[in-house]
Regions:
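Conserved class I S-adenosyl-L-methionine
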Residues: 1-55, 70-74, 157-187
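Class I SAM-dependent methyltransferase SAM/SAH-binding core
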Residues: 62, 67-114
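A conserved beta-strand element that flanks and buttresses the S-adenosyl-L-methionine
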Residues: 126
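Short catalytic micro-motifs in class I SAM-dependent methyltransferases
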Residues: 129-130
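A short glycine-rich, Lys/Arg-flanked "PGG" loop and its adjoining helix->strand segment in the class I
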Residues: 140-152
Length: 289
């Protein structure tokens, strides 16, 4: 599948399915997130980590691949800005974003690897679960595009997903065990479990050919090697996958306590869990001048 075809499939998915509301404020794409009460506080605190790396105020915040800005925490990123510029390949995403942001948003249909903005115009840049849709070569280009439009003395924050998380690989036996137990319990209770979507990176529509073919793995080594000129820092956004949360974390098993402990460990060792966990928070600072 060509790069153009990949982008077309992504656009069609989000226009026709992913960003269609199924209830108030809830989108089809929500099935790629764990929205259960047991995980709610952990997910909430992970979302807020982005704020630590953005300038608290400015004129324009670029949200590259904004989607509909679907979670309340996402709105906090631009609270101190005059405008949030939402750039997305999906027109449906931008329609939904307008419902949330109104006049405080500006909306542009755009490819994040080829941004239609002049250099150094944004006081902050954020991109959440977007770059993994691109082939690896274009991911590198997209990082440089985000850097190009960022003002000097400011930082950009990108939440992405590794194609192969060492931590999740080590814990895969536990996930399989808990999924087996869960199916057995569901059968005993006389109900079927919903099939789980196996996701190696982040919230993404699947295709017969993995995005960018991934002859090279998207991991910390790739990032440092390909973006050495930008000097990226790797922090933790969230170390465990949606599949892990759904399989292992349950209220009756003390799920909230386990997630509290996990969050504390992530805070204590943010770079380790950023490199080894599922979802890194990649921060790049642009010097002045």
């Amino acid at each position: 599948m060509s790069e153009t075809q990949v982008k077309q499939k992504v656009r069609e998915f989000y226009d026709q399915i992913g960003w269609q509301q199924v209830s108030s404020g809830l989108y089809q794409n929500a099935r790629y997130e764990d929205l259960r009460p047991v995980s709610r506080q952990y997910i909430h605190r992970c979302h807020l980590r982005v704020n630590r790396h953005l300038a608290p105020q400015g004129d324009f915040l670029l949200d590259a691949g904004s989607g509909p800005v679907q979670y309340p925490e996402y709105l906090t990123y631009s609270q101190g800005y005059r405008y949030r510029v939402c750039a997305d390949i999906s027109i449906q995403a931008l329609r939904e974003a307008r419902k949330r942001l109104g006049e405080r948003g500006l909306y542009v249909v755009a490819d994040v690897a080829n941004l239609p903005f002049r250099q150094e115009v944004f006081d902050g840049v954020v991109s959440l679960h977007t770059l993994h849709h691109l082939p690896l070569g274009e991911q590198k280009q997209a990082y440089h595009e985000l850097y190009r439009v960022l003002k000097g003395g400011r930082s950009l924050a990108v939440v992405n997903g590794w194609t192969d998380s060492p931590l999740m690989r080590r814990l895969s036996w536990l996930v399989r065990l808990m999924e087996t137990i869960g199916k057995a319990v569901a059968r005993l209770r006389g109900r079927e479990t919903l099939p789980e979507k196996t996701v190696k990176t982040a919230e993404t529509p699947s295709s017969s050919t993995p995005t960018g073919t991934f002859v090279e793995k998207l991991d910390a080594g790739w990032l440092r090697r390909e973006l050495s000129d930008l000097q990226p820092q790797i922090w933790v956004w969230r170390s465990v996958s949606v599949r892990f949360l759904r399989a292992v974390i349950h209220r009756v098993l003390g799920g909230r306590l386990w997630l509290w402990l996990l969050y504390a460990l992530e805070e204590r060792f943010p770079h380790y869990f950023g490199e080894k966990g599922q979802y890194p928070l990649i921060v790049i600072h642009k010097p002045k001048g």
